[in-house]
Amino acid sequence: ASAAVSAAPTEKEFPKTHSDVSSEQQNLKGQKGSNGGSMKLHTTDQSTFDIWRKKLQDLEFSSESPSKETSDSPWRSDILIDENCLLSPLAGEDDSFLLEGSSNEDCKPLLLPDAKPKIKDNGDLILPSPNSVPLPQVKTEKEDFIELCTPGVIKQEKLGPVYCQASFPGANIIGNKMSAISVHGVSTSGGQMYHYDMNTASLSQQQDQKPIFKVIPPIPVGSENWNRCQGSGDDSLTSLGTLNFSGRSVFSNGYSSPGMRPDVSSPPSSSSAATGPPPKLCLVCSDEASGCHYGVLTCGSCKVFFKRAVEGQH
């Protein structure tokens, strides 16, 4: 009894296979007349099975005789056949459908190139492509778009090193512009350049943008002036005069002062003649220095300032 109970749910859980149904169908054919009322449910199952078997046969013979299969199949209608059988789930293996699929394949390469230039026209910067062959035009549009972008990048890369190379007077890469900077360039406290023998206006404009780089190199010169001023008295003053003759007298804080040049008129603060050596300038106020006071080359008024500062600390 327990075995019969255990066998019952297995039959419910697992459906019958095709062989089981066929054997049961043969038994039903033999017992169809004897057991009328009890086998009535099985006859309905047999009828549904016959319908599905007939549909499978229709699908198997569809490749050989599609016209016969459409007339015999109850699942087909003329509307679905006229619509290329796209809505029928049983028409996937039809010859007529395959033939129409080949015709669709012939139409696909005609439709896809017509759709691609529309997308490229929207993506690119309004580049028309009205010709008959759109695929090479799409490639040329991409190349033209890249060529439009790359010259700007190359120009930006060229503009960057020009300023860096121009900051070093020793480099002769740029040519006349570099020689003009190294010979005639004089940095001032206002951050501007004296321009002499300039042929074009573009060079002078570029030199106006470069005094930021010109402020940095005179810093070691200022440290040499400071050390020589602390070292000895009059000898350091004469050495400072020779250093300032190059036109780059420097503050201690790194800002360059307007030095003396033989071809430039002397500033109003200097009282000496232009033919002699340039005056020694105060490192605080750029006035004419009176001497080295408290280790700093200053004028008379700044000497008092340093005196008060030093005495206030003591």
UniProtKB/Swiss-Prot annotation:
Where in this protein does the record say Phosphoserine is found? 65, 73, 88, 129, 266
The gene from which this protein is expressed is NR3C1
Describe the processing and modification events after translation: Acetylation by CLOCK reduces its binding to glucocorticoid response elements and its transcriptional activity. Increased proteasome-mediated degradation in response to glucocorticoids.
- Organism, scientific name: Ovis aries
Keywords for this protein: Chromatin regulator, Chromosome, Cytoplasm, Cytoskeleton, DNA-binding, Isopeptide bond, Lipid-binding, Metal-binding, Mitochondrion, Nucleus, Phosphoprotein, Receptor, Steroid-binding, Transcription, Transcription regulation, Ubl conjugation, Zinc, Zinc-finger
* Name of the featured protein: Glucocorticoid receptor
Q: Which GO terms describe its cellular component?
A: centrosome; chromosome; cytoplasm; mitochondrion; nuclear speck; nucleus; spindle
- The DNA-binding region ranges are 282-314
The Swiss-Prot or TrEMBL record describes its family as follows: Belongs to the nuclear hormone receptor family. NR3 subfamily.
Q: Where are the zinc fingers (NR C4-type)?
A: 282-314
